[in-house]
């Protein structure tokens, strides 16, 4: 420092202005921490907001939906339903499969939930069927969450069973070991097995029955401990040829002796190598394949995980035979990378536009350099805090930083503009920096804390929406806080060191022209401002009308939940008649796939038929359609889906439901459409009455399309009605009848072959190729007590009935779920109201309850909290401003700017054809924080002028408006241009970003036009009100008390 008397002023910035080295190193530390944090942050599409979800799957081949419900699902549900922290339990019981999906509270750690699930399964194990071939298996993955990577393994030369075996032993295990992989599942299950197909006539001719053969196979194939021999000097382990491992071994197996001659298994059956389940299949572009689905661990870095898998793929492919081909079908990180890249570009564009605006207003290249350093520094420093908070680089955090570009530059602009004003008045840069920074310090603190206060309610939002925007709010708040620190430290220090005195600044023609332009703008504003101040009630009336208009527009605008994204992936469900066979369903699926592949926007299609954890019934097929990249197709996904559905509509007997896959997954089940509504009753009989009635009513509603229900009660059932008296007289038990039927038609798993690498099942069934349909029952024979073979038909009749294909439970009670999409000209709010009206119109009994599910339930919760959220933001800001200004009145003046922003935002959304969704609401809340800064800058200077210069309120606010016009215009333009790239975005994930940009731009334009006039008018009106109250209180205090009045 130079010798001499110290220059006064500087406020909180003084120390940093006078110590440039310390300030520079402090900023370098922030920069370094931010860079390190950025390199360590994971990358994802959205913040980690998934509900802890666990799926319990139990397979019991051959069991009917009724048996699965009563014998498997119900015992498990009774135990699982007792767990603490359980939010919802839903189940599907279909032919041979029970799937229970458990959704826990967001606050419950998944590991804790896993332990409770395992304990509940153990508790229920004694109640499950003894011949259950597989124990219940649970997985810590949401079944509705799409895989991050899908691979298809195909071959023209090898059977699918061999491919499945190779995939299980060579590929799936290796991929499972990659860090970040949560679960690897195989679709199209063709696990190798030995299939024993009994010839019913040959079995009967030998006087045998299927149960005798099953017992013989079981006894012939064992793999158990045999002990060891211990001698004086050595020990010998015992082994034997107790296992039969090849098809030939089973063909030659002696199952009985007749007339002294052996009866071998090949004499009464066909034994072949085949698939464990012949009613499962997956196809990639109509080529049968084993599809590998890779799902992530919660919180894993999706891009890093996928990259690690891709790096090991060449090695995995080289380990396969040349006739086997493995390719990537879908890679979700492709769209995640593209989306994040687009947002990063928009962030850089926002920074460039903001810097351009600063130069345009300051007309000084060196002065422009200061915020050009301050803005990136504030944003980069935020990454360090994001890392310590466990956040990720995702669309929302990058959107927060993009919006923050306009926010963080505000502080720098306010400081630079105020210091520049003193330099233009002839002060030296050091003196100007100390005076300007000291004068503006309180304003910066007011702007910062009032803006952060707006974000506080977002942190207290409950449920999944609150979790989703917590990262957004904290990232934005941290960026704003770091910006305030930079603006009070680095910015004034750089102004003092690099700005030149006014006498040394030479402006070029452009800078001179822009200076004259702004002077003319200020002069024009002064004229209109005087008119507004001279006609206060007209201006005040305009301000009040914006409040009424905001309320009216809020009631009018269509409301939605979350923008539908175009991620290039379409999830489809193909529904066929309930009695369709597996073979017929495969043919239909292939026909649909061939038709869809002809569409120019489709890149590949993966299809699946069969019953597993995600597909409950045989008449439902699953499709996943991968579209070409956005830049290689002409249409967006919302236009492609109707086109594909229209093509398939020409195929008779099937219905195709399609929906775009989303980054945000709230549902716990794979559904036909985007939205669900559930009926819950005490019995299936009640549902059978009211489900068709409600379905018919819903189809009358114009707001709804693609309406369907998972209620399927028209499946064909062959009901075996046994005459128990005759059966008892012949010595045939019901257990023997069930076993005979199961052996014949259940693909019964009767034994296991153990090898060093895997385990393979022995499947028993009847060969029914020559006796299709109900005629197959004619060949069922049972052994009576006298040794005679008894045909099933002599003790039972076969009746054909209709029954449920699947039985669904919600919270252990029977339920039916309706799926629907929203019509093109309707909003989600209108669709929800239409569903609710339809349910009320049919007058269902009180014991039938209704409930929206998944996305629709989250929408209702978010919609109900919208007004409370906005009110909380306003109240939080009022409290902070009241504390800062020590006034009840001035915060009201500042908050009077808010309705103008609301009108602008809602009008912009309506003009752009967008719904008021969660993203748009966040935009409105951010506007609340932005637009009040105009009033803060005006009122701060007006109060200072009244206090320090002795000006009247009129003169003070008039002078403040003119002095602050340039920084107000600069900060508004900076915030507007920061949001402009979001509003104009067209790349991957643009649907998510655009509503936020539209709200910000519309609200800023409207508020900028009106608040420049309404704020000073309201300031004066409140000042007159305060003056009137003071005078009245003074007159009351001067009036003598009655007790002291002298008597007349």
Curated annotation (Swiss-Prot):
Membrane-topology descriptor: Multi-pass membrane protein
UniProt keyword Transmembrane helix, yes or no: yes
SUPFAM superfamilies registered for this protein in UniProt: Multidrug efflux transporter AcrB pore domain, PN1, PN2, PC1 and PC2 subdomains, Multidrug efflux transporter AcrB TolC docking domain, DN and DC subdomains, Multidrug efflux transporter AcrB transmembrane domain
Pfam families reported in the protein's UniProt record: ACR_tran
Keywords: Cell inner membrane, Cell membrane, Membrane, Transmembrane, Transmembrane helix, Transport
Localization terms from the record: Cell inner membrane
First-listed, main subcellular location of the protein, grouped into a coarse class: membrane
GO molecular function, one term: xenobiotic transmembrane transporter activity
Entry GO terms, CC: plasma membrane
InterPro entries: AcrB_DN_DC_subdom, Acrflvin-R, Multidrug-R_MdtB
Assembly and binders: Part of a tripartite efflux system composed of MdtA, MdtB and MdtC. MdtB forms a heteromultimer with MdtC.
Annotated protein name in UniProt: Multidrug resistance protein MdtB
Gene: mdtB
């Amino acid at each position: 420092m130079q010798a001499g008397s110290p220059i006064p002023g500087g406020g909180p910035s003084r120390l940093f202005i006078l110590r440039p080295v310390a300030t520079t190193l402090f900023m370098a530390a922030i920069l370094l921490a931010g860079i390190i944090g950025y390199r360590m942050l994971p990358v994802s599409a959205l913040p980690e907001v998934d509900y802890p979800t666990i799926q319990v799957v139990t397979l019991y081949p051959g069991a009917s939906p009724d048996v699965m419900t009563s014998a498997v699902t119900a015992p498990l549900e009774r135990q699982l339903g007792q767990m603490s922290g359980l939010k919802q339990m839903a189940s599907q019981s279909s032919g041979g499969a029970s799937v229970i999906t458990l959704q826990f509270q967001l606050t419950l750690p998944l590991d804790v939930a896993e332990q409770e699930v395992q304990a509940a399964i153990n508790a229920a194990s004694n109640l499950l069927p003894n011949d259950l071939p597989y124990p219940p298996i649970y997985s810590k993955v949401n079944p509705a969450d799409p895989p991050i990577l899908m691979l298809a393994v195909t071959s023209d030369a090898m059977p699918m069973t061999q491919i499945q075996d190779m995939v299980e032993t060579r590929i799936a295990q290796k991929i499972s070991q990659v860090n970040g992989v949560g679960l690897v599942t195989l679709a199209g299950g063709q696990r190798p097995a030995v299939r024993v197909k009994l010839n019913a006539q040959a079995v009967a001719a030998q006087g045998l029955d299927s149960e005798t053969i099953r017992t013989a196979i079981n006894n012939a194939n064992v793999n158990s401990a045999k002990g060891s021999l211990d001698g004086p000097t050595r020990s010998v382990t015992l082994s034997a040829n107790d296992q039969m491992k090849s098809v030939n071994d089973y063909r030659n197996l002696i199952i009985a002796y007749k007339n002294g001659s052996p009866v071998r298994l090949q004499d009464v059956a066909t034994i072949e190598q085949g698939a464990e389940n012949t009613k499962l299949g997956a196809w990639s572009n109509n080529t049968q394949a084993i599809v590998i689905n890779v799902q992530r661990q919660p919180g894993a870095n999706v891009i890093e995980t996928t990259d690690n898998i891709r790096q090991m793929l060449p090695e995995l492919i080289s380990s396969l035979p040349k006739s086997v081909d493995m390719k990537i079908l879908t890679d979700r990180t492709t769209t995640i990378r593209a989306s994040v890249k687009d947002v990063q570009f928009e962030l850089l564009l926002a920074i460039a536009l903001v810097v351009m605006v600063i130069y345009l207003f300051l007309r000084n290249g060196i002065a422009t350099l200061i915020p050009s350093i301050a803005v990136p520094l504030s944003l980069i420093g935020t990454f360090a805090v994001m890392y310590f908070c466990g956040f990720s680089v995702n669309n929302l955090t990058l959107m927060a930083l993009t919006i923050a570009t306009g926010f963080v530059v505000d502080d720098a602009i306010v400081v630079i503009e105020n210091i520049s004003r003193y330099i233009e008045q002839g002060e030296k840069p050091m003196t100007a920096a100390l005076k300007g920074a000291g004068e503006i310090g309180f304003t910066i603190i007011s702007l910062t804390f009032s803006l952060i206060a707006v974000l506080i309610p977002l942190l207290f939002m409950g449920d999944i929406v609150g979790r989703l925007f917590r990262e957004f709010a904290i990232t934005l708040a941290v960026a704003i806080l770091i910006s305030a620190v930079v603006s009070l430290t680095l910015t004034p220090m750089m102004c003092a060191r690099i700005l030149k005195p006014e006498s040394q600044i030479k402006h070029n023609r452009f800078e001179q022209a822009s200076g004259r332009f702004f002077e003319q703008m200020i002069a024009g504003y002064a004229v209109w401002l005087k008119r507004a101040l001279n006609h206060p009630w007209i201006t005040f009336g305009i301000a009040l009308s914006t409040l009424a208009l905001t309320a009216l527009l809020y009631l009018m605008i269509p409301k939605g939940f979350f923008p539908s994204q175009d991620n290039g992936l379409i999830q489809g469900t193909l529904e066929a008649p309930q009695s369709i066979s597996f073979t017929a369903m495969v043919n239909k699926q292939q026909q649909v796939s061939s038709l869809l592949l002809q569409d120019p926007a489709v890149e590949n299609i993966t299809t699946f038929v069969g019953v597993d954890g995600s597909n409950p019934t045989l008449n439902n097929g699953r499709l996943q359609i991968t579209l070409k990249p956005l830049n290689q197709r002409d249409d967006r996904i919302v236009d492609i889906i109707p086109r594909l559905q229209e093509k398939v509509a020409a195929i008779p007997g099937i219905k195709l439901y399609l929906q775009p896959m989303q980054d945000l997954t709230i549902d716990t089940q794979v559904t036909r459409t985007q939205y669900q509504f559930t009926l819950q009753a005490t019995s299936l009989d009640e549902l059978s009455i009211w489900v068709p009635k409600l379905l018919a009513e819903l189809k009358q509603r114009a707001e709804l399309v693609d309406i369907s229900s998972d209620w399927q009660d028209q499946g064909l059932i062959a009901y075996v009605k046994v005459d128990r008296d005759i059966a008892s007289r012949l010595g045939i038990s019901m257990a023997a009848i069930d076993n005979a039927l199961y052996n014949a038609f259940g693909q019964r798993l009767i034994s296991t072959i153990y090898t060093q690498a895997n385990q393979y099942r022995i499947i028993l069934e009847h060969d029914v190729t020559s006796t299709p349909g109900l005629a197959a029952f004619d060949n069922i024979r049972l052994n009576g007590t006298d040794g005679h073979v008894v045909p099933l038909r002599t003790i039972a009749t076969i009746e054909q009935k209709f029954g449920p294909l699947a039985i669904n439970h919600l919270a252990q009670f029977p339920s039916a779920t309706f799926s629907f999409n929203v019509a093109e000209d309707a909003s989600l709010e209108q669709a929800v109201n239409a569903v609710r009206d339809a349910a009320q119109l049919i007058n269902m009994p009180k014991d039938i309850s209704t409930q929206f599910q998944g996305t629709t339930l989250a929408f209702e919760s978010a919609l109900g909290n919208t007004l409370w959220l906005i009110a909380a933001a306003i109240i939080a800001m009022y409290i902070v401003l009241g504390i800062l200004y020590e006034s009840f009145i001035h915060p009201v003046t500042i908050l009077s700017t808010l309705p103008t922003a609301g009108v602008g935002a809602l009008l912009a959304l309506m003009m752009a054809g967008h719904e008021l969704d969660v993203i748009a609401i966040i935009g409105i809340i951010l506007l609340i924080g932005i637009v009040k800064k105009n009033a803060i800058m005006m009122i701060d200077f007006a109060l200072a002028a009244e206090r320090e210069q002795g000006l009247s309120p009129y003169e003070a606010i008039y002078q403040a408006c003119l002095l602050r016009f340039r920084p107000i215009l600069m900060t508004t333009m900076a915030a507007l241009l920061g949001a402009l790239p979001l509003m104009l975005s067209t790349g991957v994930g643009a649907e998510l970003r655009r509503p936020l940009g539209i709200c910000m731009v519309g609200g800023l334009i409207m508020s900028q036009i009106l608040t420049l006039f309404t704020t000073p008018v309201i300031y004066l009106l409140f000042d007159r009100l305060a003056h009137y109250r003071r005078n009245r209180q003074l007159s009351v205090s001067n009036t003598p008390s009655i007790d002291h009045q002298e008597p007349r």
